[in-house]
Amino acid sequence: MLQHARFEHWIAAPLDQVFQFFGNPQNLPRLMPPWMQVKLKDVKIVPPADLPSGNFAGTGSTVGASYRVLPGLPFRTSSVARITAFEFNHYFEDVQEKGPFKTWHHRHEFAPEVRDGVNGTLVIDQVQYDPGLGALGKIGNALFIAPQMQKTFCHRQLALEEIVHSGKLTQSG
């Protein structure tokens, strides 16, 4: 059964810098909880044709990663995501080609937004996924997957704040 999750976060940083950070897959481990021990492997970048430079993962790029699924568990899983859509400084989308879910579609959206007179960027993550396994997957989603996803995206928001405040948003990897 298809599940939906949406996460929003406003950050006091320019749209172009935030998009550049998220558009570079080497930054993914910096956003993830340390216990996940995310390791990138077999990253194949297809630069967007209309951009002169940058480390953006355009349409057709693939990102392989291995990571721990739940805190305290010793085993790792791996996944491969393919970028299926990319519009510079607006959004990009990835789908799981290989991994733990029956289906996974993640849309990353970015929009300039002023709050309390401060220029910033609204980051929106929309995820549609199916854990598979029928009724067992539905129970697993309610007990483990959805709560862990909520915690992971909360961590991503805190990590992004820390990266911005430390002045390291424009550094990669």
Language-model segments: residues:
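Beta-strand/loop substructures that line and gate deep hydrophobic ligand-binding cavities in soluble
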Residues: 93-151
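A non-catalytic, amphipathic alpha-helix used as a structural packing/dimerization or gating element
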Residues: 151-159
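Hydrophobic pocket/interface hotspot
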Residues: 17-22, 28, 63, 83, ...
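Beta-strand elements of well-folded, non-transmembrane domains
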Residues: 11-13, 67-71, 85-87, 100, ...
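Short, surface-exposed coil-to-beta transition loops
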Residues: 4-6, 76-80, 102-106
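Glycine-rich portal/gate segments that line the openings of hydrophobic small-molecule binding cavities
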Residues: 40-97, 158, 163, 167-171
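Hydrophobic ligand-binding cavity/cleft-lining segments
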Residues: 1-52
